[in-house]
Amino acid sequence: FEALSWLLDNWHLTAAGKNGRERAVLESAINTLLRGFSALSAGGADAWVLISAATRKDLRNPKGNEEVLAVDVSGFAPEGDDSAALFIVKAYRLGWRRVVAFAWRGQRFCGSGLGASSGGFRIDTYGNPGDYLGSGLDGAHLYVHGAAQDQLAQIMKSGKLVIYGDV
């Protein structure tokens, strides 16, 4: 996973340059890898666990060895009560400290709504997160492994926003 992420983040340094086809292959490989993790409902044995819009009702606090919540955001609403952004806030409030959210296709407000003093929480995004990413950020670290849209980090008080692609 780390090697694929590095390649995705540094693809402009490779011989492929800015070839979108190679980037799409890397994103597909990352999505396939993340979708291969055990479901959160399986319970506590694995460090990385997977949840999606279809299984969102299974969200709970981390147990046992669980450290990273991989969230397939492809089925979530772009914004509102059923959005990926609010789902990530719920995960944070339940005690998750790292979320890897992937398959973004324009869903908005990632990293917003975490509340004051969200230090120690990390979100990694893969795909194409929508605008208002990191707005209201107050301590959390947000890593965008790709391009980001407009309205980034509005009213950002503290934390970190790293974008490995274009803005």
Please give the residue ranges for each predicted region.
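Charge-rich, low-hydrophobicity low-complexity segments
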Residues: 1-167
